[in-house]
Amino acid sequence: MTQDQFARYSFLLDRTARKVKQYAQQQFKSGDFDVTVDQWLVLKNLSENGHLSQTELANLVFKDHPTLTRILDLLCKKGYVERVPHPLDRRSFQLHLTNTGVSKVTALRPRILEIRKKAWENLADQDFEEFKRILDTIYQNLGGQELE
């Protein structure tokens, strides 16, 4: 691959990732979701994984600790997330969804699925599989673990 091709493909990848996030943020804002995209990622991961430490959650949502702390503070204030003492380590805590948080995830999940479908609406299954294969290869080239 030439330097120009590499620059062009890198630009396209970055531009597309930014557009997907921008579109999602616009939909969240105009759709009265009461959470941001980043807050949703936290809620979704807590919903799928149960009790997590802040470090475990940070790794899942790719956020540093100060950023995640701010997000968690807001979600706790809204009543969606609760910090509970860790059963084995009194110095730390675990995070979990409250009943209100579970209800929020249940209510938002179908709406968010519709937002995600927008990006893929004109792609065939074969396009999607090839795209996934290429992204997985790039991710692994940079030291990431393969995801299912």
What do the PLM-derived regions correspond to, one by one?
Residues 54:
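Helix-turn-helix DNA-binding elements, focusing on the entry/boundary residues of the two helices
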Residues 66:
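Key DNA-contact positions within bacterial/archaeal DNA-binding proteins
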Residues 1-5, 126-148:
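C-terminal regulatory/oligomerization modules of transcriptional regulators
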Residues 51, 73-133:
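Charged, amphipathic alpha-helical coiled-coil/dimerization segments
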